[in-house]
């Protein structure tokens, strides 16, 4: 019988497009430098040279479909509450049975730490299997001792053979499985090394099949590439149920867990953690943490209140506007949309009369948050105007509102929740859209002065930073 031949192909790790030769740019998705080498088996032709005969449909099958009405949807039975409230929030209330959850993040950000702590919490009442392909069993033990993780119901195995691991899962039937990491796993019947597109794709598919068949929730750790996306084919993110990103500056203790895909919950929720010597600790009051250490009495700072899912979070926005010596001024934004910053600068120039053409502009969101909500437009504009005029925004004043191209301040959703959070934290003045204010009862917020503005110029005058 003829054997399969091996051939080298190049696969785009963004869209999965294949090519017989290397290309600098993927012809399908247009991404640059994403074609990676892979080795696949090419089926050999028969001695007669004929194509394989088509599969004959017999009309017989062993499949037994269920009536949809008979499928159990009881929440208590379909989810596992982890005991880590911030993680449960991001997942939509707990881990769904049989779900496959992919978690990615930069090296050293804390992926293995949070999963080991998760195993410890779940193991209090259930059995857990932790599979490591990167560390030895002894190394995992040392970390578990440092984190003070319960160890009675946690089984650990150092293995990278996917078929062996799947067989072990079928045999043990644990209540939770952790695979750390998918880039170290390999299928022996796939003719390529670990971490290649073919290996990652096939390994993910086999783990998915075992998880769905046995209703065992499975966490898979994925490495990220230089652009911050999870390394490997995009099909891996498509087939899993949930994709989580663990974000944060490694020089700071704060970590943010964010869902970019979630079949069983919202993708707008975030979980916040503090990295300590004893592992990750939950941050139950993120607004207070985000505002800690913000400069007082210095120009260029304005406080915003953003909605992260159902949770309002206060965040300090910093702007630095300085005169440039070069013909092309520099624009930099960290944690805020770069193109949105350009739009707001244009509105400030056209509608408010400020000149930024000879100024470098830098925007930074304190605490490592990424603000993509249009309700941050007004505080960003006020921060830039404050820095340009070198006049500080009052310490206990926050701003909420979307800014249109005409300089108008547009209404935002969930304003009541934002104002309650501002009141709880201790702010005394809130600059809000006038349209929103007309529909609010100011008596609900004693001690918080509400200032309604219809245009950007009114907001600047309201906080008295206009010369």
Show the residue positions of the predicted features.
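Divalent metal-dependent catalytic cores for phosphoryl transfer on phosphate-bearing substrates
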Residues: 137
């Amino acid at each position: 019988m003829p054997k399969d031949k091996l051939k080298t192909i190049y696969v785009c790790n963004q869209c999965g497009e294949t090519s017989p030769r290397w290309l600098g740019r993927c012809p399908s998705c247009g991404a640059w430098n994403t074609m990676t080498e892979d080795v696949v088996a090419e089926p050999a032709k028969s001695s007669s040279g004929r194509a394989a005969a088509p599969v004959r449909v017999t009309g017989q099958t062993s499949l037994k479909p269920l009536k949809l009405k008979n499928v159990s949807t009881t929440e208590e039975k379909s989810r596992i509450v982890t005991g880590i409230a911030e993680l449960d929030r991001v997942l939509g209330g707990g881990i769904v049975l049989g779900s496959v959850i992919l978690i990615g993040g930069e090296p050293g950000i804390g992926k293995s730490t949070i999963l080991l702590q998760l195993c410890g919490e779940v193991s209090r009442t259930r059995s857990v299997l932790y599979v490591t392909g990167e560390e030895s069993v002894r190394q995992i033990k040392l970390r578990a001792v440092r984190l003070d993780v319960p160890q009675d119901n946690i089984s650990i195995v150092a293995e990278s053979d996917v078929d062996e691991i799947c067989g072990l899962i079928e045999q043990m039937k644990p209540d939770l499985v952790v695979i750390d990491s998918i880039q170290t796993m390999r299928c022996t019947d796939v003719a390529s090394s670990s971490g290649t597109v073919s290996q990652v794709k096939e390994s993910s598919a086999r783990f998915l099949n075992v998880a769905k068949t046995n209703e065992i929730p499975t966490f898979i750790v994925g490495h990220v590439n230089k652009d911050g996306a999870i390394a490997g084919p995009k099909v891996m993110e498509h087939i899993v149920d949930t994709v989580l990103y663990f974000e944060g500056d490694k020089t700071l203790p704060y970590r943010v867990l964010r869902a970019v895909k979630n079949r069983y919950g919202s993708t707008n929720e975030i979980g916040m953690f503090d990295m300590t010597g004893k592992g990750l600790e939950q941050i139950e009051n993120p607004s207070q943490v985000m505002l800690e250490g913000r400069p007082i009495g210095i120009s260029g700072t304005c406080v915003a209140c953003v909605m992260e899912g159902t949770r309002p979070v206060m965040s300090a926005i910093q702007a630095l506007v300085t005169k440039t010596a070069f013909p092309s001024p520099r624009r930099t934004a960290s944690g805020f949309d770069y193109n949105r910053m350009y739009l707001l600068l244009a509105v400030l120039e056209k509608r408010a009369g400020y000149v930024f053409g000879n100024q470098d502009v830098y925007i930074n969101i304190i605490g490592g948050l990424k603000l993509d909500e249009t309700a941050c437009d007004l505080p960003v504009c006020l921060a830039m105007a404050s820095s340009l005029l070198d006049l500080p925004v009052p310490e206990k004043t926050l701003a909420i509102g979307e800014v249109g191209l005409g300089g108008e301040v547009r209404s935002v959703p969930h304003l009541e929740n934002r104002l309650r959070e501002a009141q709880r934290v201790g702010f005394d003045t809130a600059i809000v859209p006038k349209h929103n204010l007309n529909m609010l009862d100011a008596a609900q917020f004693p001690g918080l002065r509400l200032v309604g503005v219809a245009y950007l110029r009114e907001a600047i005058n309201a906080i008295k930073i206009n010369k």
